[in-house]
Amino acid sequence: MQTSYVIFTDSTGDLTPALIEQCELQVMPMAFNLDGADYRNYPDGREMSPHEFYEKLRGGSLCKTSQIPISEFVDAFTPVLEQGLDILYLAFSSGLSGTFQSSRLAVEELKEKYPARRMICVDSLQASMGEGLFAYLVAQKRLQGAALDEAARYASDLAPSDRKSVV
């Protein structure tokens, strides 16, 4: 069934490229710094594979993450809004990153230019595979034909009831 919205999430959910495609998700890559070098966490591992990343951590490398900037949300959301579609963003836990807040600020900025479009941000309260499972479950609702409000309500109900983080 055709729905009139796109689901975005971020790469900290550790979903495979195949699952991302199957679920019709748009993924925002998170930035990280490892031993002084900056990278983006793309699901396809184009800048660093998960294997290499964890090998470096086991070897004593230090990693720092940074939230997705407002400008990157604006750049990612704008083409979708210009197509006349709405947005549901499923964010990395606000307890671990400022990314959720950045997404909300981007939405406030975009509402001025696209007042007829709906943009909903939901804090997953998750990280890693817990966040990935969260995004997968919400995406399944969308694929089953759930409208934006129904999918957002499902996501909001799901978030506080499952506070586990699978590592």
Model regions and ranges:
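N-terminal glycine-rich anion-binding loop in soluble enzyme alpha/beta folds
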Residues: V6-E72
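Short, charged beta->alpha transition segments
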Residues: I70-V80, L105-V107
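Glycine-rich phosphate/diphosphate-binding loops that line cofactor/substrate pockets in enzymes
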Residues: M1, D75-I87
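Residue-level detector of anion-binding/catalytic polar loops
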Residues: Q26, D86, A147
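A short helix-to-beta-strand connector/capping loop
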Residues: T3-S4, Q22-L25, Y114-R118
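Active-site histidine-anchored catalytic micro-motif
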Residues: Q83, F92, S97-D162
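Conserved small/polar residues in nucleotide/adenosyl-binding loops
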Residues: V166-V167
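General beta-strand structural signal in soluble alpha/beta enzymes
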Residues: I7-T9, S66, Y89, I120-D123
